[in-house]
Regions:
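N-terminal leader segment of winged-helix/HTH proteins
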Residues: 1-70, 119
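C-terminal ligand-sensing/allosteric alpha-helical core of TetR-family HTH transcriptional regulators
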Residues: 44-59, 142, 170-181
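N-terminal helix-turn-helix DNA-binding core of bacterial DNA-binding proteins
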Residues: 61-102
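Charged, amphipathic alpha-helical coiled-coil/dimerization segments
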Residues: 112-169
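Short amphipathic alpha-helical interaction segments
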Residues: 101-116
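Terminal interaction helix/tail motif
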Residues: 148-196
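Pre-recognition alpha-helix immediately N-terminal to the DNA-recognition helix
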Residues: 48, 78-82, 141
Length: 196
């Protein structure tokens, strides 16, 4: 039998009612993530962010595919470019920190894929924790070709956007702040999950 809050209460002989969340009346045509004006604005922002993220990762995969025959995802390209950043070897933990990623198994998969493809190589200890990754000569030339195609494609488009230069720095700072808010909100959600 599936254990629900009600069955747990019956089994314990308790007459307490399960906690209920305050109800918000939905407007006709609205939905569960946009019941108030603030929620609607947040939902619009989040959908824009989702579309941007998906377009960005498709762009990275397409840009790399134009200069290299190795089939990589946008996530793989992000790992490759971070490994190449500053031309200094990096540990998996550093790659995760730079990309704000905690999904270590997926990062390990991406680095193994990039090693097998000959774009990066390992250096140092055989310990997974201490292993560092660096771009190979092939990886270096592929990332250079990627950077050249990116420079020839995106900057001219962005410069055509009115006010792009002035807004880009402010937007970058705001995105970092919003990223911190989402991280904090995730912590709050986890603590609430364990409350009775």
């Amino acid at each position: 039998m599936k254990r629900t809050t009600n069955t747990a209460l019956k089994k314990n002989g308790s007459t307490a009612k399960p906690k209920t969340q305050p109800t918000v009346v939905e407007r006709p045509g609205s939905w569960h993530l946009a019941r108030t004006e603030t929620e609607r604005r947040l939902s619009d922002f989040e959908f824009g962010l989702e579309r941007l993220a998906q377009a960005y990762y498709r762009w990275k995969a397409a840009c790399l595919a134009a200069v290299c025959d190795v089939p990589l995802t946008g996530d793989d390209v992000a790992v490759l470019n971070v490994v190449r950043m500053g031309d200094e070897p990096k540990r998996l933990s550093e790659i995760g920190q730079l990309l704000n990623r905690v999904d270590v198994p997926n990062l390990q998969y991406a680095t193994r894929k990039l090693v097998r493809s000959g774009l990066i190589e390992t250096e140092g200890s055989s310990s997974r924790k201490e292993t560092r990754y660096r771009a190979t000569a092939t990886g270096h030339s592929v990332t250079e070709a990627y950077a050249a195609l990116r420079a020839a494609t995106l900057p001219p488009m962005l410069e055509a956007l009115d006010g792009w230069a002035a807004k880009s720095e402010t937007t970058s700072i705001q995105l970092d702040l919003i990223s911190s808010l989402y991280a904090q909100a995730a912590q709050v959600a986890i603590t609430r999950r364990h409350q009775p």
